[in-house]
Amino acid sequence: MNVKGFRFSAVEAAIKKPGRLDLALICSDAPAAVAAVYTTNKVKAAPVLLDMERTTSGTCRAVVVNSGNANACTGDRGMEDARETTSLVAERIGASEHEVLVCSTGVIGVPLPMERIRGGIPSLVAGLGSATLDQIAAAIMTTDTFPKLEARTGTAGGVGYTIAGIAKGAGMIMPNMATMLAFVVTDAAVDPQWLDRVFRRANDTSFNAITVDGDMSTNDTAIIMANGAAGNPVLSEGSEGAAEFAVLLEEVLLSLAKLIVKDGEGATKFVEVTVKGARSDADAKRAAMAVANSCLVKTAFFGQDANWGRIFAAVGYSGADVEPDRAELFFDDVRMVQGGVFAGGDAEARGTGVLRKKEFTVTVDLHLGDGRATVYTSDLSYDYVKINADYRT
């Protein structure tokens, strides 16, 4: 996939197991507008803290990413290692150190193997242009089972452009952000301040609307770079083509977010949870996330048990305003609850049939207002426990 003005590279630096790409570089030939969102965990990894400082400038040349080590909870050394990594890249691409961002993912509490990173960076930079975005997606994987890539094309002022994104993440996935990294590149010319706003809006309905296990990581980062190489008139609030760009960006991020859930550790189901008729959108999101994060609900999904009571209970303890005798609950189009009680008839059998599917929807209508939210989740299987019990061994 070609995105004008961007080059990619990935190498094996022996950070992960032998034979796996684990050091990647995304580089723009010219300074690019940049926006980013980060984990809300109060325990933030060194690369997150460094990037938070640097993205305030609104411009960026490159992002270097390692997988296999999170560089989190590593003290002063962790920050020194993050800075050195960006410095080594910057001097080889002819950029300021402050124009280079760094991301890490992997085991927490272990210092970066800097001798391996130092050894890998010369070939990483020399190989710019030799890798595809698919290979970068593979290089940033940890417990993922497949690389995640999505792209869209659009036009602005009669000029075509591309938006392409990659992501990783399969566990510790819950808003806001989670063990997930996402990188979006576009050759569209975009005003930096508007890019920041539109990127945050798109994140709210995508990466901040997914959960696999309710855990929040120390490293989560989503970055977008827009280098203007397409040559379109600069996109900004209300400009021609701005609305289309915003829609396409949201489509890319939502598709990546769904792929993360589908690749959830041990996941066998993909479930869309919608709460509507709430007092507010915030109430709806609160209730939907309570359902999507409930271990009892998720194990019922895995067991294909139409246990609507667990869902109803999760809505009740979510903190959202609920009047039980008004509520309805559906599995796909099968009404399981009406007026706060079991719908009766053949609902149990039909609901069980829905839960046998790989993908289905759960809809709760509170009948209290116009608030609405949708989140995406998976089931919780035996394999999730095994994957995470064995993670460091």
Swiss-Prot record:
Q: Which Pfam families match?
A: ArgJ
Which residues does UniProt mark as catalytic? 179
Q: Give the record's GO biological process terms.
A: L-arginine biosynthetic process; ornithine biosynthetic process
Sorted alphabetically, which InterPro entries does this protein's record hold? Arg_biosynth_ArgJ, ArgJ-like_dom_sf, ArgJ_beta_C
Q: What is its EC number?
A: 2.3.1.35, 2.3.1.1
GO cellular component entries: cytoplasm
Q: Where is this site: Involved in the stabilization of negative charge on the oxyanion by the formation of the oxyanion hole?
A: 105-106
Q: Which reaction does it catalyse?
A: N(2)-acetyl-L-ornithine + L-glutamate = N-acetyl-L-glutamate + L-ornithine; L-glutamate + acetyl-CoA = N-acetyl-L-glutamate + CoA + H(+)
Residues annotated as binding substrate are 142, 168, 179, 265, 388, 393
The primary location reported for this protein is cytoplasm
Source organism, top-level taxon:
Bacteria
Q: Where is this site: Cleavage?
A: 178-179
Where does this protein reside within or beyond the cell?
Answer: Cytoplasm
Q: Which SUPFAM superfamilies match?
A: DmpA/ArgJ-like (SSF56266)
**Which pathway is this protein assigned to?**
Amino-acid biosynthesis; L-arginine biosynthesis; L-ornithine and N-acetyl-L-glutamate from L-glutamate and N(2)-acetyl-L-ornithine (cyclic): step 1/1; Amino-acid biosynthesis; L-arginine biosynthesis; N(2)-acetyl-L-ornithine from L-glutamate: step 1/4
Instruction: List keywords of the entry alphabetically.
Output: Acyltransferase, Amino-acid biosynthesis, Arginine biosynthesis, Autocatalytic cleavage, Cytoplasm, Multifunctional enzyme, Transferase
Q: Which CDD domains does this chain map to? A: OAT
Q: Which GO terms describe its molecular function?
A: glutamate N-acetyltransferase activity; L-glutamate N-acetyltransferase activity
The protein's job, in short, is: Catalyzes two activities which are involved in the cyclic version of arginine biosynthesis: the synthesis of N-acetylglutamate from glutamate and acetyl-CoA as the acetyl donor, and of ornithine by transacetylation between N(2)-acetylornithine and glutamate.
How this chain assembles, per its entry, is: Heterotetramer of two alpha and two beta chains.
| NCBIfam families for this protein | ArgJ, PRK05388.1
Q: Which family does it belong to?
A: Belongs to the ArgJ family.
Query: Mind telling me what this protein is named?
Result: Arginine biosynthesis bifunctional protein ArgJ
**Source organism (scientific name):** Geobacter sulfurreducens (strain ATCC 51573 / DSM 12127 / PCA)
